[in-house]
Design a protein with these regions (language model features):
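Membrane-embedded alpha-helical bundles of multi-pass transporters/translocases
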Residues: 1-192
């Protein structure tokens, strides 16, 4: 297990996975608050998540195709760039539509979530596939199959990203910003 800490390629993939886990869990953890408190579309939250995950399934085929045509690294990088641009773009769109009717806000939101959903399924499977490649290279070098231990190492450390993403935003919102989750859209304009 100690040898994994010295494997730079594996640790880069683990770091990428931790950051991805944090980012995806952070957006997921804050989604209901965002829908209810910011957009005041709480009734649409479950349908919006359904749209997001439906397009995530569709996205699997796109990212697999790109990874086969080019490389896994390129496909994962492109996927993360695409997700990052859409994530930033959505903030400007939300500011633009904040005073629109409920129907317009819901329609625009569903479109953005569909486009963002395409990226949701891309990077994680590609990173796991690259970890499998590292495991195969390690086995070829040492003639010992360590794939189980390597994936245990990868999965355990990746869970750190999920853990921080669940705890950090709520602590920050309540302790630093003063946002009260129980108030929903009745929070002050500053805390929203």
């Amino acid at each position: 297990f100690k040898r994994f800490f010295k494997n730079k390629t594996l640790n880069r993939l683990v770091l990428a996975s931790v950051l991805l886990a944090f980012a995806q869990s952070l957006t997921g953890g804050l989604f209901v608050i965002f829908m209810d408190s910011i957009l005041e579309l709480g009734d649409y939250a479950s349908r919006a998540i359904f749209v997001n995950f439906t397009f995530a399934v569709i996205g699997i085929f796109l990212w697999r195709y790109i990874s086969l045509k080019y490389t896994k690294h390129f496909a994962a990088s492109l996927c993360l760039l695409y997700a990052g641009i859409l994530f930033l773009l959505q903030f400007f769109v939300v500011l633009y539509i904040s005073d629109a009717s409920e129907t317009v806000k819901a329609g625009v939101l569903f479109f953005i979530l569909a486009m963002y959903g395409i990226s949701f399924s891309g990077a994680a499977p590609l990173i796991i596939s690259m970890v499998a490649d590292v495991s195969d290279a390690e086995e070829a070098e040492s003639d010992i199959n360590k794939s189980g231990a390597m994936f245990a190492y990868y999965t355990t450390i990746t869970k750190v990203g999920y853990t921080f993403a669940v705890a950090f935003p709520y602590i920050f919102l309540e302790s630093v910003i003063g946002f009260d989750i129980s108030l929903g859209s009745d929070n002050s304009q500053f805390t929203k």
